[in-house]
């Protein structure tokens, strides 16, 4: 880093006590923060939005839910073109990558819990999207640093007992969790762009 350079990070700990700015990158527009659709919680509808790659933890998640006797479904949004048939598992539905904001918001609204099974993350946009649509989020211990001061994020161990225990907790306390989530101050695209 030269003497005229300035460090920019999305997390304070990444700066390692060096001078720099903390930014909150975001693609959240006003569209994400209005016209909320009430979630129905009788049937658990899990959502994952992201690439279908090992490092994203999706295969680990599929293994965790494979033998469950709980009534639920999982929608995966992020398959590459012509690869939606790569995952064949009961109650799992795979869809291609969705880039249209309106359609993506509908996916979040049509589900009641978002799952981010990644092994590593920096500043996941999908986490902000789920929170913007007031959908509780389940993550695993490896990325618990992404929680920060945000409400509505739950940490599970990477096993089915812990995962479904968290789902049950969310299902039984959904309204209260959503009330807490309304207190979240999420970064927006406009706020991010004003910094530069």
Regions found by a protein language model. Give the residues of each.
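A conserved mid-protein helix/loop that constitutes part of the nucleotide-sugar donor-binding site
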Residues: 44, 48-67
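Short alpha-helical donor nucleotide-sugar binding micro-motif in glycosyltransferases
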Residues: 106-111
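A charged, aromatic-enriched C-terminal amphipathic alpha-helix characteristic of glycosyltransferases
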Residues: 174-196
């Amino acid at each position: 880093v030269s003497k005229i350079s300035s460090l920019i990070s999305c997390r304070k700990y990444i700066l390692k006590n060096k001078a720099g700015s903390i930014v909150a990158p975001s693609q959240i527009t006003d569209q994400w923060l209005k016209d909320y659709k009430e979630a129905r919680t009788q049937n658990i509808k899990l959502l994952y939005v992201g690439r279908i790659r090992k490092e994203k933890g999706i295969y680990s998640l599929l293994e965790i839910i494979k033998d469950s006797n709980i009534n639920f479904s999982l929608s995966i949004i992020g398959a590459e073109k012509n690869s939606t048939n790569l995952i064949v598992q009961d109650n799992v539905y795979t869809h291609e990558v969705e880039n249209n904001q309106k359609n993506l918001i509908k996916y979040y609204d049509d589900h009641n819990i978002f799952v981010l099974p990644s092994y590593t993350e920096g500043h996941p946009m999908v986490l902000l999207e789920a929170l913007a649509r007031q959908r509780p989020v389940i993550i695993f211990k490896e990325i618990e640093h992404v929680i920060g001061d945000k409400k509505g994020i739950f940490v599970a161990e990477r096993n089915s007992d812990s995962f479904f225990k968290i789902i049950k907790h969310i299902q039984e306390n959904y309204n209260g969790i959503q009330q807490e989530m309304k207190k979240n101050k999420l970064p927006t695209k406009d706020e991010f762009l004003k910094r530069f």
